Design a protein with these regions (language model features):
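C-terminal alpha-helical cap/extension of soluble enzyme domains
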Residues: 2-9, 15-26, 49-52, 225-226, ...
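Active-site beta->alpha loop and helix N-cap motifs at the rims of alpha/beta catalytic domains
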Residues: 2-167, 305-308, 331-334
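Conserved, mostly hydrophobic/aromatic
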Residues: 31, 46, 79, 118, ...
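Repeat-unit-sized solenoid/scaffold elements
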Residues: 129-144, 188-204, 227-229, 292-298, ...
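General structural feature for long, well-ordered alpha-helical segments within catalytic domains
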Residues: 35-42, 71, 75, 110, ...
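Catalytic alpha/beta core domains of metabolic enzymes, predominantly
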Residues: 149-152, 164-272, 276-280
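Short, intrinsically disordered/low-complexity patches at protein termini
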Residues: 58-59, 134-135, 184, 283-287, ...
Length: 337
């Protein structure tokens, strides 16, 4: 690993920053196998062209729930290989982007196995979502011991993840207790803003707090002093190689150029609206993958129980995409040439 157990918090505070993206997994349309070549192209595009700082691999966006254990490990392997390429665009730089691997599972043995695999192959961190606890009316002690146990079995830095799908949310106070675990370094806190703002105040020096909402990212930099967007798909669905406005407003906000950053952030509203208005309520995965295809990325198919878009839904999405204002090519350069 790149750090020792007792260095996990300091390492993450220094390097776990910027824009991270939750990687979707492209599946081939014929046999629904992982499209490894397509995934590699996507990762190179996200890092080299879009300037994404880190990748969240094999999470919910990546459809981990429909994958075998070997498939989840394979995604991790590919991500480490691509982010640690010896020469990215001729720069000679190594590990231009970091990785956080989802070891989330209801089976604790699987969590440990995936976390150990991530550690062995050189991933930077793992993320483990809070366990689903059936019939529980109180969960704090169970969750605390759950993460303490995982941390006792692996040395890699751990990010917590609390989201409504679990049937409950971790309180800011419980998260602050969890932040005392030496290798707990961050949390993806998919909760109302007042909850993650409170946790930021309670435990800022012990845990990096973030949430997946891109709509709130700018405000969280400016008002809460956040350093990390962890994370969802907007870093690669709102941007192209010649239209990196999320990267731009993030860097401006980090530099304290708040009003300039706000203007760039607001200019993306037509893109956000196009995505929201055309996304069928029951087909978020297929919609995102089709949007990726329109961007020239490998989107691919979804696995059951997820559903594909109809031709009418694709047509509506394409029309909105073409009108949203995202630039796909450098028109000024093309005209000059």
């Amino acid at each position: 690993m790149k750090y020792r157990r007792h260095e996990a918090k300091d390492y993450s505070r220094q390097y776990m920053r910027g824009i991270w993206a939750a990687a979707a997994t492209p599946f081939t349309p014929d046999d629904l196998a992982i499209d490894e070549a397509g995934l590699r192209r996507n990762i190179r595009h996200w890092i080299d062209d879009l300037g994404i700082d880190g990748l969240f691999i094999a999470g919910k966006q990546g459809e981990f729930f429909s994958m075998s254990l070997p498939e989840r490990k394979r995604l991790m392997d590919i991500a480490v290989e691509e982010t640690q390429r010896a020469d990215l665009k001729g720069s000679g730089a190594k590990a231009k982007a970091q990785t956080i691997m989802s070891a989330s599972d209801q089976n604790l043995d699987t969590v440990i196995e995936l976390a150990r695999h991530a550690e062995a192959i050189g991933a930077d961190y793992v993320v483990v979502h809070a366990p689903t606890l059936h019939f529980h009316n109180a969960h704090d002690d169970c969750v605390l011991q759950y993460y303490e146990y995982i941390a006792s079995k692996v040395g890699i830095g751990i990010a917590l993840w609390s989201h409504p799908d679990n049937g409950y949310l971790l309180s800011p106070e419980l998260c602050a207790r969890l932040a005392e675990i030496p290798t707990v370094v961050a949390i993806k806190y998919s909760v109302p803003r007042e909850m993650y703002a409170r946790l930021t105040r309670l435990a800022r020096t012990k845990i990096i707090v973030s949430t997946a909402s891109e709509d709130e990212w700018f405000d969280n930099i400016v008002e809460l002093g956040w350093q990390l967007y962890l994370c969802s798909s907007p870093p690669y669905t709102l941007q192209t190689s010649v239209d990196r406005r999320m990267r731009a407003y993030t860097d401006l906000a980090f530099a304290g150029k708040v009003e300039e950053a706000r203007g760039v952030r607001d200019s993306l509203d037509p893109v956000r609206d196009a995505i929201r208005k055309t996304k069928p309520a029951g087909k978020p995965y297929a919609h995102q993958k089709y949007w990726q295809e329109l961007l020239g990325q490998a989107g691919g198919a979804v696995r059951r129980p997820l559903l594909e878009l109809t031709e009418a839904e694709k047509a509506a999405t394409k029309a909105a995409f073409e009108a949203c204002g995202l630039r796909l090519s450098d028109t000024k350069r093309a005209a000059a040439e």
